[in-house]
Amino acid sequence: MTFSFHHHLRDGDYVVNLVMAAAIEELGLKDLTIAATSLGSAHDPIADYIEQGKVVGIQTSGIRGRMGEVVSAGKLKTPAVIRSHGGRPRAIEAGEVHIDIAFVAAPTSDCVGNCRGVGGKSDCGSLGYAMTDTKYADHVVVVTDCLVDFPNFPAS
């Protein structure tokens, strides 16, 4: 199963950690692939899941921190796939990457999932880079700490 994430919140993004902890520790999922735009030191806890063999694949444009060290040490079950920022959406559109669930961290969202990169406590700008994931994923989950009235407008 492949989960996608975006790094709009940079090193303040703990959505990857929360989702993976719930999927692995609470739901007992395994053989997971992370398709993230980029992974940094905020995502160091994921290194444990790689070492345990729960996360078996990574597709991203960058891996830093402890997770990068674990992957460089050969502990990931399958080779990590590193693509440019433009190569990632192209691979998704071409069907080279299948996303089961796209998780989009957003500063604001309304009750039907219209999300924006502004207006909340953690503005990050345009969420346009997440559009390919949300278009091609089997399921989309918007994660926010600021629920706003419908419609969340204008789009960003």
Q: What spans do the regions from the language model cover?
A:
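Conserved alpha/beta enzyme-core scaffold
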Residues: M1-S156
